[in-house]
């Protein structure tokens, strides 16, 4: 419920803030909250670990949210909600390509199609769909960024730190 409402609330806030300002406020609140929950500073062992954290921060924290917020400037929140729901599909494809141990089965494709159709009908509820190519394409790029982030996050999680430490 909260996840789905972010598109609408972000769209409203973008009337008063730029995408960068909105992200700054959002991440500042998140960072301060995480500092309270986990005040200990994470010490990384080597440069390779730092690269994984930089990639996760760049793809999943900055680029995904920046592109998504920018897309909301050009298209409807409903479009973003529906289009971004394809991120798990991109994630599965990328995980299969990067980690051959991740199975890619036909039941996933069928389940994805059924879920996407359900999300589409719930989101549009009989209303006409309004396409906005610039915003809709940016949303697809955001979904791809989330897929890259998800694959990078698998590597970050293998470093053995807690989720709060990884997020902070």
Features from the language model and the residues they span:
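Specific transmembrane alpha-helical segments of multi-pass solute transporters/efflux pumps
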Residues: 1-2, 6-7, 35-84, 121
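Juxtamembrane C-cap of transmembrane helices in multi-pass membrane transport proteins
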Residues: 2-17, 29, 65-75, 83, ...
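Small-residue-rich packing faces within the transmembrane alpha-helices of Major Facilitator Superfamily
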Residues: 4, 24, 28-32, 116, ...
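Juxtamembrane helix-entry segments on the extracytoplasmic side of multipass membrane proteins
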Residues: 16-20, 24, 45-51, 124-145
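Transmembrane alpha-helical segments that form core, pore/gating elements
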Residues: 31-34, 91-93, 129-168
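Hydrophobic transmembrane alpha-helices of multi-pass small-molecule transport proteins
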Residues: 34, 54, 86, 93-94, ...
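Cytoplasmic-side transmembrane-helix entry/capping segments in multi-pass membrane proteins
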Residues: 48-58, 103-116, 135-139, 161-168
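Residue-level hotspots within the lipid-embedded alpha helices of multi-pass solute transporters
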Residues: 57-61, 85, 139-147
